[in-house]
Amino acid sequence: MPEKPALEGLEGKWGSRWQEDGTYLFDRAAAIAAGRDAVYSIDTPPPTASGSLHIGHVFSYTHTDVVARFQRMLGKRVFYPMGWDDNGLPTERRVQNYYGVRCDPTLPYEPGLTPPFEGGDNKSSKAADQKPISRRNFIELCERLTVEDEKQFEALWRSLGLSVDWSQTYRTIGEESLRTSQLAFLRNVKRGEAYQALAPTLWDITFRTAVAQAELEDRDQPSAYHRVAFHGEAGPVFIETTRPELLPACVALVAHPDDERYQPLLGTTVRTPVFGVEVPVVAHHLAQPDKGSGIAMICTFGDITDVTWWRELDLPNRAIIGFDGRIVSDAPEAIDTEAGREAYAQLAGKTVFSAKQTVVELLRASGDLVGEPKPIQHPVKFFEKGDKPLEIVSTRQWYVKNGARDEELRERLIELGRGIDWHPDFMRVRYENWVNGLTGDWLISRQRFFGVPIPVWYPLDAGGNPVFDAPILPLEESLPIDPSSAAAPGYTEQQRGQAGGFVGEHDVMDTWMTSSLTPQLAGGWHRDDELFAAVSPYDLRPQGQDIIRTWLFSTLLRSQLEDGVAPWTHAALSGFIVDPDRKKMSKSKGNVVTPADVLERHGSDAVRYWAASSRLGTDAAFDPQNPTQIKIGRRLAIKLLNAAKFILGFDAPASLDLAQVTVPLDRSMLQQLTDVITDATAALDAYDHARALETTETFFWTFCDDYLELVKERAYGEASTGQVSAVVALRMALSAFLRLFAPVLPFAAEEAWRWWNEGSVHLAAWPAAAETSVGGNDARAVLNVLGRALTGIRGAKTAAKASQRTPVDSAVIAGPAGDLAVIESAADDLRSVGRIVELRFTAGADLAVADIVLTQAPEEER
């Protein structure tokens, strides 16, 4: 036991010891032998291994670790793995920026490639500034950088004190993850749950890839309404649009069927301005009479509503935007006039922004622009990781059915969600709203490089064209496989790309196709059947509320499609971290705080205290300039060490027994501690770590401020039943407090526990009420009454501007007879702590210090 306990250095000291001792290892054989009920399994969220963690990660992962430590102390065999989400766009972008490269699949592999910014910090993300390299070279760089990032992440998690079993890790780009992802996909295909379709697709022009509904976010953007005249037999028809550049792609005008203004036009045709194409006027219930002029143009494609109208009204496709976000060179066939084609030629090859400016000038010149554009701000769809608005292009993609167009599947997903215990419960409604609001099946193919290859080939017909309706699937035992480098079953590599041969699928899976299988990846699905049976269904899925629509929903979907069983029994959802202005912290807003410096400056226990002080689903403010809660947590951890050192300074009997606690004050403290144990246990059972911490902390300060002060003179005294009673009560309380705080303050609790115990506090049994319960409802009152009397004595000294160590010649305490009787039973303790020579009592309505006479210091001391 050190002379002066300190928090500094505890993370390294105990982190190393836990690793050496295997404190948190999951014993697979013992767990299988004990059965599923003896295991507590956690579907840990794999953080994206691309860059740095932020304070929000520390916040939510601490919540999970508190649960893991609590369950371990309850005697459960805790399966607490860690994964790294290291495939997908975030990794690709980081590699591009870090090494100054970009992937060009047409280039050959270059052995021993040295990227231009090897080990540097390239700030540019412009393709023009990056060296093009082959796909294989690019993937090698992705592998290299993610491994380094993961080492840094693990070091930070260890310093935070996560009780993860570091032998149970996986990477979403690792070989087993590839195999599992491809196996699950093949089964989706064979059951008809995964399919291909040529359809309008949300497209990010920067990354040149399709994007799923779950990856969208709205961002307010400046725009303008342009009032434009179409020409009909009865005269002009005015529409208002924010996208005049799509006039060449217009296929119809649409109005609400009940809008009397336009009912006479329904079934007629009008001519588009500038381009001179005849288009029909149609009716649809999604048209908004109160928006703009009440009649809108349908283009292929300006937004999702255009896609709905196009599909449901069976309209032609006249798409004009290419994969690069520029206007394609060939005009739609419907533009058949010389003037129309000349106008279109002015747009070809331009960006959407430039094309818009050109069309506005053409409209102004033709007289079809009415007035000037009216500036507005409106929400525009972006890929959540993208920088430019999404476009909609027609592409062939792979999809997985998700209930958007299958009512039976949608209802099964809703019921599956209702079978899970949500913490907090209102998060279930968000899940159901997402399921009910889906507009299309899950688009799972991505036109990227670093991801799980879609394990499919296509036969080529006599003309060398892919036969997409007859995909070639690999044997399950051949997985994992990359169709871009492995020949299709029944073919040789020489037949690749040849008529009558085959071509490999070049797309990769959406990263969520792998992340949606985290229970299977960690638990050994179709790799270790005994382990999977021991941990599945998992007890807990912890995560952030912002990825309900992605990670949580997709995991439920994959489980429903695979076996119809919910993958976990509990879902715990953390709130957001907000800045002092209550704005959500995010990388895009530039207000993210990285945790390494915070942990270094304040210590891990203090940061964990801040995180654990917030309930699930509740946002927490973080001010790096004045982290008040973290400072409170540090003070608490130091107090725990100091209290332990103080208590352990008293010699205690070799064995502790409740029967040795005979003094009413001591018994009162233990009975109140019993209530704390009961309440904290119930709170943690209900996934309310904040209430458990608050309950424990509140009584701990009462224990330190009142009880310790009241009994220390007796504990210091000569051996007697009263002295033994105090010391035994103190030791019992310390044992309970260290275990109660252990899930939140693991380093301080371990340090103090090891001063007088063998083994780790984190493998000790969670405190039980029976350990400290002395029985009797009256026992609780003694400490409360003595505490109030002590507060009165302290208050009187403070009012007299005297030190708390100032002796008291005499004090009179007034109060009800019952309270006075309690105080008289512990009068010696009160006299000692208050330094009171004479203590008298008198009847009164309320407990109070009626009179106090402080000892006057000698003249020379004044």
Curated annotation (Swiss-Prot):
GO cellular component, one term: cytosol
Molecular function GO terms recorded: aminoacyl-tRNA deacylase activity; ATP binding; valine-tRNA ligase activity
Annotated organism of origin: Leifsonia xyli subsp. xyli (strain CTCB07)
'KMSKS' region, short sequence motif: residues: 584-588
Gene responsible for this protein: valS
Keyword terms of this UniProt record: Aminoacyl-tRNA synthetase, ATP-binding, Cytoplasm, Ligase, Nucleotide-binding, Protein biosynthesis
EC number: 6.1.1.9
Family matches, as PROSITE patterns: AA_TRNA_LIGASE_I
EC class: ligase
Biased composition (Basic and acidic residues): 120-129
Short motif ('HIGH' region): ranges: 47-57
Function text: Catalyzes the attachment of valine to tRNA(Val). As ValRS can inadvertently accommodate and process structurally similar amino acids such as threonine, to avoid such errors, it has a 'posttransfer' editing activity that hydrolyzes mischarged Thr-tRNA(Val) in a tRNA-dependent manner.
Region spans: Disordered: 110-130
Comment on protein domains: ValRS has two distinct active sites: one for aminoacylation and one for editing. The misactivated threonine is translocated from the active site to the editing site.
Protein name in UniProt: Valine--tRNA ligase
